[in-house]
Regions:
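Transmembrane-helix motifs of polytopic, lipid-linked glycan transferases
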Residues: 86-107, 145, 149
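Short periplasmic/luminal acceptor-recognition loop of GT-C membrane glycosyltransferases, typified by
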Residues: 357-442
């Protein structure tokens, strides 16, 4: 029995390696990660490794845990995402492991393991996973871990031992210092568990859980604060992470439409099927109440902000509840065939894998880097302006010369002024610009290019497919004489234009 239990996590670890390799652009299969957010994180990690102070010398508004993680990844490789790739494998494994444990709370069927693999496959191949290296991806195993112990308490009145509660607190602390909006999940869970404990006269047990969870949060917080105290940048941390996110960041919508409508409609339907049935099957009222509390409050939190579609990746934490459909199912050959077909269909509609195989994966950043690297000199500094981080800093092995090295959804006149001064000063040899069709804040941060710069690279390429943009556009596309599968494989396209300007001698 012990041997079987040992082989199971090894199998899940190998499967996590497989799906991460196939679907994350951080893996060695892909030449680069084209996502601007991921490149921002890695650029900041490189800058911190080179001695720059976070939020003071280089700026973004996410939490410090994210950048410290990328600093550690940069220790392994400064111009690739191999360090993040290894972290992603661990996260995928932990997510599937605790999803499996959650399923086994409600079923002893042998279907739980293959179903767990299917959920892991669907999660990483979904549009919500995007390119990989998102805050939501790294938070998903933490939510799955916490949800398992909360469901176990709600279903069986079984309280976690002290070290399990401590680890839940450490996970909560990591989320606190990565993206505090996700704490809505915990708020809903804690309030629901408090009510359940009160009804069953288990307030003492709940008190012990809260005590050790709090200790875990403190344990995760101490090294974070110690880092900023040592660097004398606590005030910058508070201002950049809390004040900016609460009062300034609103997530600029694209093309004048709410970002929610980017959410792929088909995957939304699949996600609903996987999670919502809990409310329509026979289960203890405590379990339903807990799911409603965590699920509902987290979903409600999205209504308070401009939502990027990949935020909804967090909802896959609830996907193990699909076991309610199969809790008495005995898997047969047809079961495995069905699972395989679903996996193949999901992979066949995965943008990352499809474009890698058909040769249309965006590679213009590598071409730009090759041009810049071929003409390197002592003053060949690189500056991106009026655009996101394209990854040019990693591939040219440069660091940004300025603090605000990319445009963000914060329309800040000080950031605009700093970027404009750097562009017009003529201090850098190369100016790199990305003009994206999906971003509306380019014009705000635009700056005139000095006359002594000339364009040496100009290329437009496919950046991303969008299954839908707005409801009326989605319905309009369906009126065309094409079958649904053709629509899936030939959706709305988004192009980006990449330019490099070189200063004349």
């Amino acid at each position: 029995m012990k041997q079987t239990d040992f082989r199971e996590p090894i199998f899940l670890l190998l499967f996590a390696t497989l799906i991460t390799t196939l679907f994350s652009t951080c893996s060695f299969l892909y030449p680069l990660n084209p996502w601007d957010d991921a490149n921002v994180y890695m650029t900041i990690g490189n800058a911190m490794l080179s001695g720059k102070d976070l939020y003071v010398d280089i700026f973004d508004h996410k939490g410090p845990v994210l950048y410290l993680m990328h600093e550690m990844a940069a220790m392994l490789s400064r111009n690739s995402f191999v360090g993040i790739y290894l972290i992603e494998i661990l996260c995928s494994f932990c997510f599937m492991w605790y999803s499996l444990q959650t399923m086994r709370l409600f079923s002893s069927s042998k279907i739980t393991l293959p179903l767990t693999c299917l959920l892991g496959w669907l999660t990483l191949s979904s549009d919500l996973f995007y390119y990989g290296d998102s805050v939501e991806e790294f938070s998903l195993p933490i939510l799955a871990h916490c949800l398992y112990f909360m469901l176990r308490f709600a279903k069986n009145r079984q309280t976690p031992v002290w070290w399990q509660s401590l680890f839940m607190g450490i996970g909560l602390g990591l989320i606190l210092w990565t993206k505090f909006n996700i704490l809505f999940f915990y708020i809903g869970g804690i309030l629901t568990l408090a009510f359940i404990a009160w009804r069953h006269q288990q307030m003492k047990e709940l008190g012990h859980i809260v005590m050790w969870v709090t200790a875990g949060v403190v344990l995760a917080t101490i090294p974070i604060l110690a880092y900023f105290v040592a660097h004398g940048t606590v005030e910058a941390l508070i201002d950049a992470y809390f004040m900016v996110n609460i009062f300034q960041y609103h997530g600029t919508a694209t093309n004048g439409e709410p970002d929610f409508w980017w959410f792929p409609l088909m995957k939304l339907a699949i996600w609903a099927v996987l999670t919502l049935p809990i409310f329509f099957v026979r289960a203890r009222w405590e379990v339903k109440l807990l799911i409603l509390g965590t699920y509902g409050v987290l979903l409600l939190s999205f209504a308070t902000m401009t939502v990027q579609f990949y935020y909804f990746l967090l909802m896959y934490a609830f996907s193990p509840l699909v076991i309610y459909f199969f809790r008495n199912h005995i898997p047969t050959f047809r079961t495995y065939v069905a699972i395989a077909l679903i996996g193949i269909l999901s992979a066949a509609t995965n943008w990352n894998l499809v474009t890698l195989l058909n040769g249309t994966f965006p590679k213009s950043v590598l071409e730009m880097a090759e041009i810049i690297n071929a003409n390197k000199s002592d003053d060949s500094e690189v500056l991106t302006f009026s655009s996101y981080d394209t990854g040019i800093y990693q591939h040219t092995r440069h660091l940004p010369p300025n603090k605000n090295f990319f445009i963000s959804s914060i329309l800040d006149p000080e950031i605009k002024k700093e970027q404009a001064e750097w562009v017009t000063s003529g201090k850098v040899k190369y100016l790199v610009r990305e003009i994206g069709a999906i971003v509306t804040c380019h014009e705000y941060y635009d700056a005139p290019i000095p006359e002594n710069y000339h364009c040496i690279y100009d290329k437009e390429e496919l950046f991303r497919y969008r299954l839908i943009t707005t409801p009326h556009k989605f319905l309009w596309n369906l009126t065309y004489p094409r079958v649904l599968l053709q629509y899936i494989m030939d959706p709305v396209t988004v192009n980006q234009r990449m330019l490099v300007y070189e200063r004349e001698p």
